[in-house]
Structures are given as C-alpha cells and as structure tokens.
Design a protein with these regions (language model features):
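Transmembrane and membrane-interface helices of multi-pass
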Residues: 1-98
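Active-site-proximal alpha/beta segments of enzymes that process anionic O-linked groups
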Residues: 78-143, 151-299
Length: 299
C-alpha cells in the first residue's frame, strides 16, 4: 500500500523517526492485513506437535537445513548465472526487492557506513565567510526567516501554472518568486534535508567520501545568530551546532491536537520572541531563523 522498498534510505528513516511520525502509518487496513497474514502461521505453530530434542541435535538439524538450502540456492544460480548476473548488474535496485535479504543488506550498509556516525569528523567549509556590509549601529539588524518542510508537488502548485488555484493567497502577491527549476535531493527528510543545506549538488552529495559542515555553520561563523525551530521529526543533524529547539505541544492551543501534533501556524505564536533572541547587546550582526514545518506530511 505504501509503495516502498527496504533500502538504506528507508532503514535510515526508520532509525530517525519518532512516535508521532510513525503513527501516521498505522491504519485499520494495516492492522487487519497483519492479522490476516499472520493468523494462519501463528495457528500452525501453536498446533504443531513439537518434539523435544537436545541442544546439539537442534543445532545439527539447523546446520543441515541451512547447508541444504545454501547448496540448492547455489545450484539454481549456477544454472542461470549468465542472465542472472547481467540482470543484477543492470538493475541494481532489484536487490531491494528480495525479502528478507533486502532488510539485512540495507541495515548492514547503513550500520557500516562511516558517514552515518553522529561523531564523524566534519570537514570545514567557508572558513573565510564574513558579512561584507555589516548593519550600522543605528539600524536594526537584518532578519532572514527560512521556512523548510514538506510541501506540495511542483506540478500541483498554483504558482507554477497548475490549473487549480491551490495557492490563492500567494497568487495575490506580486513579490513572490517561484523557482521552477529546483529539485529535491529525495522524498524523505533524512535524505533531502542534509543535502539541501550542503554545498554540493545531489549527485556529489550522495557520492561524497566525507561529511562537511553545512550552510548554518557558515552563517554562524560569519557572525549571524542562527536559530532552528523544529515542528517535525528533527533537523537530522543540520542544527546540531547552532541554537535549536523542538516545538513543544501546547495543550491550550487550538492549533494542537490531543495526540500532541501542532499545525505549523502554532510556531508563529512565539516568533516575536525568537526575533528578539539574542539580546541586541550581544553585538548581533543579523539573525537567521529556520522554521522546520510539518507541512503536507504523510505516508
């Protein structure tokens, strides 16, 4: 139903998700499917007449069955080796369709990838970054408000020529620029967010040999005050070295439901406080506030 395969990206999503995000995937249909598919095997196991055996005997039986299956698999592959090897070389994504090997392969690939480690060494970028024209002492420091998160598909966006006006309020403005030639690095937050804030293209990012600092690190080094407010499942390490906060559920806020999920507009209630942070006496050269929204998030 979800149209997914268990690849390294999906394993990464599973590791980095939270309860609120995972609960979006739970439905009556999913529960009924699990029950219907598992009822017969469970009943068979419960009714089976299991004979007690020694640990050595059980181990010997397991080894014998595994060896037999391995030999049989090798013989099958040997008989069709040439077309099989050619197919696997030309269609590498097929390895993620083989259950349950795809789960083991993807999990091992993520676990052994040094770039996945949270303590991996970062290569510095933009060490010469600076503000060319700092604000005068008599003028207010500039503020950049950057909204990041799930959005509609570009082809279904009213500003981009979609036949239905899906952006009625934005369409009334004359100061809106829609970048129609912008492409996401992926369809999951764990893939697209780090790539979006990197200095590399999509191709170079996914083939990189080391981890680098991101745009927020460069802005902070240049003297700007950077703050990340998250209303989703985290910043995926992007905001690890700048001030950040997970948006808290507000029980009395009509924009928050009983499950603890708040609409993105709830973040605007405290936006004025974020703009005043840090105090002006800190020599602030400007502020960058990132709002990571839930957006049109879903399974």
């Amino acid at each position: 139903n979800y149209g997914i395969v268990i690849d390294p990206g999906m394993v990464r999503n599973t590791i980095q998700t939270d309860v609120a995000e995972a609960s979006d995937l739970v439905s009556v249909q999913m529960l009924l499917t699990v029950v219907m598919l598992s009822a017969v095997p469970i009943a068979f196991i419960c009714l089976a007449n299991v004979k007690k055996t020694t640990a050595v005997g059980s181990l010997a039986t397991s080894i014998a069955l595994s060896a037999t299956g391995l030999v049989f698999s090798i013989l099958c592959i040997f008989l069709i080796y040439q077309p099989f090897s050619s197919t696997m070389r030309n269609h590498t994504k097929m390895r993620y369709l083989i259950n349950p090997l795809n789960t083991f392969y993807s999990t091992i690939k993520v676990a052994t990838n040094p770039l996945e480690r949270t303590n991996a060494e970062l290569s510095k970028i933009g060490q010469d970054a600076k503000i060319i024209t700092p604000p005068a002492e008599t003028t207010a420091a500039p503020i950049l408000l950057l909204v990041v998160g799930e959005t509609a598909r570009s082809e279904s966006f009213g500003l981009n020529g979609y036949e239905r006006n899906t952006t009625p309020q934005l369409s009334q403005r004359t100061d809106i620029f829609s970048s129609k030639n912008a492409w996401s690095c992926g369809t999951s937050t764990a893939e697209s967010l780090p790539c979006m804030f990197s200095h590399m293209s999509r191709e170079k990012y996914f083939s990189r040999k080391q981890n680098y600092e991101n745009m927020l690190d460069v802005l902070s080094r240049a003297g700007l005050s950077v703050f990340w407010l998250d209303n989703q499942s985290g910043c995926k390490g992007i905001c690890a070295r700048v001030a950040n906060e997970q948006f808290k559920h507000q029980p009395n806020n009509p924009l928050c439901d009983k499950e603890g999920v708040c609409q993105d507009a709830a973040m605007l209630d405290s936006l004025e406080e974020r703009i005043k942070w840090p105090p002006t006496n800190t020599g602030d050269k400007g502020k960058v506030i990132v709002l990571h929204q839930m957006g049109s998030h879903g399974p």
